[in-house]
Amino acid sequence: MAYPANYRYTREHEWIELSGSIGAIGITDYAQKSLGDIVYVDSPKVGDAVTAGATFGSVESVKAVSDLYSPVTGTVTAVNDELKTAPDKINEKPHEAWIIKVEIADPAQVNALLDAAAYEAFIAEES
């Protein structure tokens, strides 16, 4: 699967898609393949603060529970409630199934993240 060129990525396998000062955050195709079938998503509430590099929730699969790490610091503006009843949407379309949306406190943080080519090189080294 191709990694969207307009997204930015973390070494913990999260992605962020920007729309102005709002970032939609999810997990990459590489992450969902490593996890297997996702059965539960634990996410923060609207209004909660998230910090770059810190955990903001977790995904549970048939194999393991994996922490989610925020790529940016900010405030949660939306939670994808569809994932509460259909967490497998992450397996089906990992780069469309956002988990939370965040009002980004410092847009410069996004520039420090990996672009698609750098992320693909990173996962090639990990494999």
What do these predicted ranges mean?
Residues 71, 85, 114:
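Charged, alpha-helix-enriched surfaces in structured cytosolic catalytic cores
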Residues 13, 59, 68, 73-76:
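Conserved hydrophobic positions within beta-strands
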Residues 76-93:
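Short, charge-rich, low-complexity interaction segments located
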Residues 58-69, 86-88:
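Short, Lys/Arg- and Gly-enriched loop/turn segments at beta-strand edges
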Residues 63, 83, 106:
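Residue-level detector of flexible, active-site-proximal loop/helix-junction positions
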Residues 1-55, 92-127:
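Acidic, low-complexity mobile loops and tails
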